[in-house]
Amino acid sequence: MPDPRFFEDLGPIELGELAVLSGARLMDLSAASRVIRSVSVVAGAPADSITFASDSGYLDQVRATTAAACFLRERDAAAAPEGCSVLVTSTPQAAYAMAAGRLHSPRTATGDAGVSALAQLEAGVILGPGVVIGAGAQIGRGTRIGANSVIGPGVALGRDCEISANVTIGFALIGDRVRILAGAAIGEPGFGATLGAAGLIDIPQLGRVIIQDGVSIGANSCVDRGAFNDTVIGENTKIDNQVQIAHNVRVGRNCVMAAHTGISGSVTIGDGVQFGGRAGVTDHVTIGDGARVGAASGVMKDVPAGETWVGMPARPVRRWMREAAWLARMAGRKEGD
């Protein structure tokens, strides 16, 4: 279930109505009046939720799901366990996106500009001109917030934090002694779209951002909220200016990311990992504890703990050096040698 501090529950819907909305076919029409209250990922789904699987790699999770219903391709329908109603569609993720938009809505700041009467500020909080703080937000003692920054509804911001000017924070739980510099955007929707019957549609991003104690985030950097699970930045990690961290990323403790690093969705990064400037990481890979990624490198697969990888595509540094040396020798050879 999406966090109610950040997402409004729009009320239940029956499976029959959901089938019409999504363009899916309900296999068991006797289940048309079954009530759905939320969307969920396949694993650990609540009993009154609907989920989806568009990749056969998730069918083992479908077989074990506790969801009330699941959007599946017809070829995968048999994977649904007893008690899980199947809605057949050629575009399960698009159907899920439509269901998510019907059942959940992001909370937004309403009312007059300024600090909501429903926000909670501890003693010693300092606000610059033009700061907006939404309903239900909590700001810890000694935190300073710069001019024209926006703290969205429900956000929790710890003690002794420094938030510079023109920062936007939403859908986030932030620890103590966190430093976020000018222009950073925390908790915006992750980049998620899928192809439906009428073209590309946005997938509602229903997760949060968790930033632990002592983290620094540079100017104009972005940390997107999760698609459903959270985006997490571990304790004491230091992030430079203009860094992009996508949805569902999990960054460990004491990591360093130099400027222009880009981390794609659902990447897992261990503790003490270092990234040179303009390094990039493709989605769904794991980078082990203490690994290092060289500047302008492109990581396309898992990096083992403690190793240094460089190049495009990135590979172990010793291999890269041998390849570079061989290429230099070949380039220096005269014709006929």
For the regions a language model picked out, list residue spans one by one.
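Terminal amphipathic alpha-helical/low-complexity segments used for targeting or macromolecular assembly
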Residues: 1-114, 177, 183-184, 189-202, ...
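Structural signal for interior beta-strand "rungs" in well-ordered beta-sheet cores
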Residues: 52, 114-316
